[in-house]
């Protein structure tokens, strides 16, 4: 077991487990209906969670935008400059195994402190990392009460802004969708089930008119020159590809009259 899981191995030595009072950085919340209790810890640093985090990535459910590599890089290069302080919530079972990770942060403003997801505007999807055993410990009906307890344990915040949350995380329902105040965005993302081959999928999803327009677009593209798919291999090629991408997107943003996200620090 990693040091972080050993830390919670003997539940009787944790103050929250003996007197049931919530402390600043750890709290034991009992869930009803004879379900196991959940130990919640709050972490203000990302790096010490690396081993537990990456292990949960491999065995549980999450999106690419909740991986340790993504979140730690964002916090290091962007979050710190924006004044966002990590307030990462980890839920543990009675054996010291991680049940879930909520990569949250506190954005400190002049008038108020805002609770939000780490990753900011650069993540397409915001969600918890969930162990495959999560639903055995906390049911959808129980999660709102657990969330209320979590918020009491988190650092002071006045506003909660949780956006871009998918209905499902991997094969599991997203427990965050059980909370009050959740509203579907008018530009909600869509998901689709892929088939064994492209032709079957394309034939099912596109009408004859759409296919005709696709062929016309392809012919116009070919008039500009040969079309090929190239995967950059070396570091220099990858950087050059990103530079070209950002340059082209900047031109597109200017033409559309929208803010250029690449101008941000």
Predicted regions and their residues:
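Non-catalytic accessory segments adjacent to catalytic cores
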Residues: 137-194
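Short beta-strand-to-loop capping motifs
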Residues: 130-133, 192-196, 233
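Short, intrinsically disordered terminal tails adjacent to the first/last structured region
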Residues: 1-34
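A short, internal acetyl-CoA/4′-phosphopantetheine-binding micro-motif in the GNAT/acyltransferase core
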Residues: 121, 128-137
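Generic hydrophobic/packing signal
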Residues: 106-108, 129-132, 154
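A conserved beta-strand-loop-helix scaffold within acyl/acetyltransferase catalytic domains
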Residues: 36-116, 165-188, 197-265
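Short, solvent-exposed loop/turn segments at the edges of secondary structure
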Residues: 120-125, 185-187
């Amino acid at each position: 077991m990693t040091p972080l899981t050993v830390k919670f191995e003997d539940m009787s030595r944790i103050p929250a487990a003996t007197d049931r009072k919530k402390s600043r950085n750890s709290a034991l919340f009992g869930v009803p209906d004879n379900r196991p209790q959940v130990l919640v810890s709050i972490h203000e640093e990302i790096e010490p969670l690396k081993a537990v985090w990456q292990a949960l990535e491999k065995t549980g459910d999450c999106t690419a935008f909740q991986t340790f590599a993504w979140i730690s890089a964002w916090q290091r290069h962007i979050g710190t400059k924006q004044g966002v302080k990590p307030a990462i919530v980890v839920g543990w079972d009675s054996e010291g195994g991680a049940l879930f990770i909520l990569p949250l942060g506190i954005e400190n403003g002049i008038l108020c402190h805002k609770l939000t997801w780490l990753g900011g505007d650069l993540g397409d999807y915001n969600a918890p990392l969930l162990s495959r055993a999560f639903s055995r410990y906390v049911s959808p009906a129980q999660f709102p009460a657990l969330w209320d307890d979590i918020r009491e344990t988190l650092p002071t915040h006045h506003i909660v802004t949780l956006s871009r949350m998918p209905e499902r995380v991997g094969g599991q329902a997203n427990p965050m969708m059980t909370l009050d105040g959740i509203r579907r965005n008018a530009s909600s993302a869509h998901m689709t089930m892929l088939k064994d081959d492209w032709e079957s999928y394309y034939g099912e999803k596109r009408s004859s008119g759409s296919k005709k327009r696709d062929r016309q677009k392809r012919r116009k593209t070919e008039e500009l020159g040969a079309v090929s798919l190239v995967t950059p291999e070396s570091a220099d090629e990858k950087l050059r590809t990103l530079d070209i991408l950002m340059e082209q997107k900047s031109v597109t943003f200017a033409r559309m009259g929208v803010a250029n996200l690449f101008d941000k620090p």
